[in-house]
Amino acid sequence: DKVGVLYIAFEEVVEFFTECSVYSSDGWGVKWYGSDGTTMSAGLIAYTTAAAFSYTTGFINPIFSPTQSDKWQKVHDEVQNVLGRAPDSYTYVAYDIVWVLALSLLEADAHDSGAVRAVLPTVAQNYFGASGWIVLDENGDRASADYDLWIIDKLDTTYEWKYVGKYVQATDSIIWGTPPP
């Protein structure tokens, strides 16, 4: 209970888990954690061996959770309408990046990267976008964020992604919807 595996990857997780299952069907009895690069991987549920390994290990995957608001809903509905599918969480972030940059250009009143860089943190801090409030740390990264937690669940002979909870940064806690196995 004091050892776990953090696997940060993208679609190569399918091949890695398929190979791992050759040596241990239960992941050596330790908890496995993924990243936003593995969350909602279509390959992980399409390939039965990798899906079974994910399911058996309780492979938990976090992904940025935008604040749901009227702005969030507007972007969600527009993307759904145009693409025929719901946007992923980083769609809201990309939308906000464009707006913060545009507003920073207007605030700086110059097309000078130094002038834009000087005003961007303040512009971001005062902007509530489709992803929520944007407060940056000293490195220019988002200072805080919540994360949705997903696992792979088994349905008869197939697998699907299942939302199980949310990490809430403000309280440094997890609110479980359905606790993982």
Regions found by a protein language model. Give the residues of each.
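Hydrophobic alpha-helical
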Residues: 3-24, 100
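Extracellular/periplasmic periplasmic-binding protein-like sensory domains
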Residues: 17-95, 106, 153, 174-180
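A general structural motif
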Residues: 1-2, 29
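Segments of small-molecule ligand-sensing domains
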Residues: 78-91, 102-163
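Short, glycine-/Ser/Thr-/acidic-enriched flexible segments
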Residues: 11-12, 39, 154-157
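Short, cationic low-complexity segments
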Residues: 162-181
